[in-house]
Amino acid sequence: MAEGGRAEPEEQERGSSRPRPPSARDLQLALAELYEDEMKCKSSKPDRSTPATCRSPRTPPHRLYSGDHKYDGLHIVQPPTGKIVNELFKEAREHGAVPLNEATRSSREDKTKSFTGGGYRLGNSFYKRSEYIYGENQLQDVQVLLKLWRNGFSLDDGELRPYSDPTNAQFLESVKRGETPLELQRLVHGAQVNLDMEDHQDQEYIKPRLRFKAFSGEGQKLGSLTPEIVSTPSSPEEEDKSILNAAVLIDDSMPTTKIQIRLADGSRLVQRFNSTHRILDVRDFIVRSRPEFATTDFILVTSFPSKELTDETVTLQEADILNTVILQQLK
């Protein structure tokens, strides 16, 4: 230290070499460089491709609550649609579902347009089955087509059923386990069900176009004059056919019933009858609805247990076939 308290030049030089505290600007620059390095690191990582099963942008999962309040009860996160469909196919395969051969499908479904996507068939129901063994006639089997869309699923040509509905979720859970859903068992009255699945998860639900031709005859209307057609997708040639030219006179003052008739060509007719109508009236209705069967020898049998309706003079009530499914079999 020199006189007057002034520092020697050597001491001033040492004092000026001390590090100064970082300023706010220095901190901002450091943070900016750190952020740029992190972004470069992320961009250098290879992008993982979206699985082939996810064909639409991923949507956030729906959140459901089983309690009365949002913060009360069990919290359930519903997976996106693609995950639902993929897991359904995966678990169905694990429970014995097999790919449906296109040749087999086309030979079995003459009235269905050929589908080029994947499909799986599930086996028998989880119920205890009867010891009755069906023969080779495949008409004993009831075919149901399950179409899985982006926004829900449909059965045959039915309406869209959202995945978020608890009843629909229970239906799909049964399919996942390789079981025939209870809903289908009740529908077919114990007949064997073959369930086919089609993957349409890259499409929104498409409502099938049904074509009806009204009855053009004359007469006094007592009830339903035209049959209800449960249609399957058909070719343009088949759509041009007239299948609604039969009339069944219904007495609404008497008990009525609905009979579903599965024809030998795979199509179905549903018609309302009085319980006093006879088996012969059902046969006559089939022939008048589908004239191509007028010269064909066929029989009518119940679906389950299989029994031929030999006495066609008995009433529907006496034959115990009210609100049931009967099958047409060619001789």
Curated annotation (Swiss-Prot):
Subcellular location: Nucleus; Cytoplasm, Cytosol; Endoplasmic reticulum; Golgi apparatus
Modified residues (N-acetylalanine): 2
Pfam families xref list: SEP (PF08059), UBX (PF00789)
Cross-referenced InterPro entries: NSFL1C_SEP_dom_sf, SEP_domain, Ubiquitin-like_domsf, UBX_dom
Amino acid composition bias (Basic and acidic residues), ranges on this chain: 1-16, 37-48
Coiled-coil segments on the chain, per record: none
Residues with Phosphoserine modification: 56, 66, 231, 234-235
Location of region: Disordered: 1-70
Keyword Endoplasmic reticulum belongs to the record: yes
Modified residues (Phosphothreonine): 59
Domain SEP: 141-206
Family membership: Belongs to the NSFL1C family.
Protein's name in the database: UBX domain-containing protein 2B
Species name: Mus musculus (Mouse)
